[in-house]
């Protein structure tokens, strides 16, 4: 009897030892497989250097500021350049082949024939109503005129920045500007804008809400108006809506594929809204020549340096979106 019990006990003991050995062997094998898999994944991630685009990324408006200029140090073989100039330039040059001549000169700087487009506009006021910038790089030439300095500044502010605009129903609602980036932009053949600031009881401050003749006039018969009022205060507006479209706009950031070249003038245009900060003159340059041929020759000479200060990763500006966007 004792022999049978002793044998049974040995069998159980051997079974436990064997099971424990098998379990440890399986554990070591699983650890080896897991560690090897993690090592392979780590090495693969380093080698591939994979990037994840567009997964739960916040929408911030302008995308171009997060990219490095892709054209830096390379020929501009796949890019387009639009050169906007006033009618007076063509009139003064008086040569039917002048654009062909400039195209050949741009070719010497690495811009293939057909990649540079010459766009003419009548004057600053007309261009302000319908600015459309479609090329990868856009250079706008403005002849300085002391009588149009403020109009030039507003146009530069419009085209050098990206704006998100929504319609305004001024007949039904009051409006307020929330911060420095919030502006009211009006375009049209004739924009006259009056405002009446309101207190917390929606009563006019220095004006009568029922009498537009008591409103403060901030623009008179202009084609482009960027209106800035006191932030955080409701305003009732009066606008010549028959000849003007006004939008509530938010500045998203710089439109980095646009540069403004000022022809003449003592100082470069300043498009800064905040008087306490340094002048905002990014991508605003000045050329001091009397003759337009010399202006264009200078642009050809410095076109690549000008483009290096820009980036082609910006949205195209189409004023039709301003008028019809809902």
From Swiss-Prot:
TM spans (from-to): none
Binding site for Ca(2+) 2: 177, 228-229, 231, 301
Principal subcellular localization: virion
Record-linked InterPro entries: VP7, VP7_1, VP7_2
CC terms in the record's Gene Ontology section: host cell endoplasmic reticulum lumen; T=13 icosahedral viral capsid; viral outer capsid
Annotated region (LVD motif), positions in chain: 237-239
Region named CNP motif: 165-167
GO MF assignments: metal ion binding
Disulfide bonds: 82-135, 165-249, 191-244, 196-207
Keywords (A to Z) from UniProt: Calcium, Capsid protein, Disulfide bond, Glycoprotein, Host endoplasmic reticulum, Host-virus interaction, Metal-binding, Outer capsid protein, Signal, T=13 icosahedral capsid protein, Virion
Family to which this protein belongs: Belongs to the rotavirus VP7 family.
Something else known: Some rotavirus strains are neuraminidase-sensitive and require sialic acid to attach to the cell surface. Some rotavirus strains are integrin-dependent. Some rotavirus strains depend on ganglioside for their entry into the host cell. Hsp70 also seems to be involved in the entry of some strains.
Subunit: Homotrimer; disulfide-linked. 2 Ca(2+) ions bound at each subunit interface in the trimer hold the trimer together. Interacts with the intermediate capsid protein VP6. Interacts with the outer capsid protein VP5*.
The protein, known as: Outer capsid glycoprotein VP7
Lineage, uppermost ranks: Viruses, Riboviria, Orthornavirae, Duplornaviricota, Resentoviricetes
